[in-house]
Amino acid sequence: MDQRLSGYATRAVPRYTSYPTVPHFSPDIGPDDYATWLSALDPTDPLSLYLHVPFCKKVCWYCGCNMKLSARYQPIADYAATLRKEIGLVAGYLPTRMRVSHMHWGGGTPTSLSESDLGHAMEVIDHHFSFASDAELAIESDPRTLSGDMIKHLAGLGFNRASFGVQEFDPQVQLAINRVQPPDMVRASVDGLRAAGIANINFDLIYGLPHQTVGTLTRTIELCAAMRPNRIALFGYAHVPWMAKAQRMIDAAALPGAAERLAQAQAASEALVAMGYVAIGLDHFALPDDPLALAVRQGTLRRNFQGYTTDTATTLLGMGATSIGRTPHGYTQSIAETRAWTRAVEAGTLPIAKGCALTADDTLRGWVIEQLMCNGRVDLAAAAAQHKAPLGWYAEAEPDLAQMERDGLIYRDAAHRITMTKAGAPLVRTVAAVFDAYLRAKAAQHSVAV
């Protein structure tokens, strides 16, 4: 990377899976606001569901997710029972039995639920919602614990996409992050899912891990590509031990520096493209016939809390402790602590801890940021016209944009269009950040740009 650009790579900026971002959510938004927003939804619009199951059998030291260890099943069963109640509670505020276009189970490890508890949850969902004929039903799992019986059960419940956290296959790296899973173990799960009819497989990979090199990551990609997952997400490891306690187990001295991280990201991207994958936005890759690649060609790619998506629904209902949702009126996040979340649901209260009511300015800036993140370009004049804003609404960003143009991150034209350059594309988060009014007003802790 050009020396002019390298300074941008170490800037701490959000991943922009929402705007405003989660650090700017406020406890002033609560259950009453969410109830009002739910009842105001257009009953003819499709929506998406996200269900969070925080339980895992082992702690992966790189993980920054909200997760819990449980040696016994009873706490998981209790959680599943409360989740079923929350589904009914949320549905009770909707104007009708609404149609679902996407559903995603995340965690944690959602397949830590028993077949019975997962099945009962799906029965409750089916009672309160209908599914579009082409709905995507996705679930995250762990090849170290996924059984053949659970695979058959998932297929029977209608799931059509599964996601695995592969991260890295090098044994030394796996030991350093406390996630040991040989390639054959992952392949067995992939083969089992596809044999059962769940043909769509996602892998997550991470660069910037302890002891990781360009060589280990490239070899991991070769092994992954041989299994032909439909989608691969490639994330940079964010070392934030002050936020994610498990990361305190990672030897910070073994982490690659900024130049090595950048080399890993570039080598991985080039390897995936060479192996037939289409680059999607900042950090995703897909086979050419995958709906995500089609969305890029059609200009319909979106970005949400799961990353890049084909989901165009304007409402995402989050259920489960710490889950995040969105309606056209704003964002909400549920209570993170499971006992407090349980008490709220048992009391018949929507378990909202905080959120953000969207202003017209939020909607405008969020649209611009999403266009940059998804398409690598944005028409600022069109944004102003579409959102009924003056053309100079982004005046405070102009000095930064001018500098970024001089440094070769972006092209600009007289029609107020911005396009990422090839060299600047990996730094799109940094460009998006100049439109973030909250980031300008209040410094927040985020991961570095690459």
Residue ranges and their predicted role:
Residues 1-48:
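Flexible, acidic/Gly-rich N-terminal and inter-domain linker regions that tether
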Residues 390-405:
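Short amphipathic alpha-helical interaction segments
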Residues 423-450:
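Short, amphipathic alpha-helical interaction segments positioned at domain boundaries
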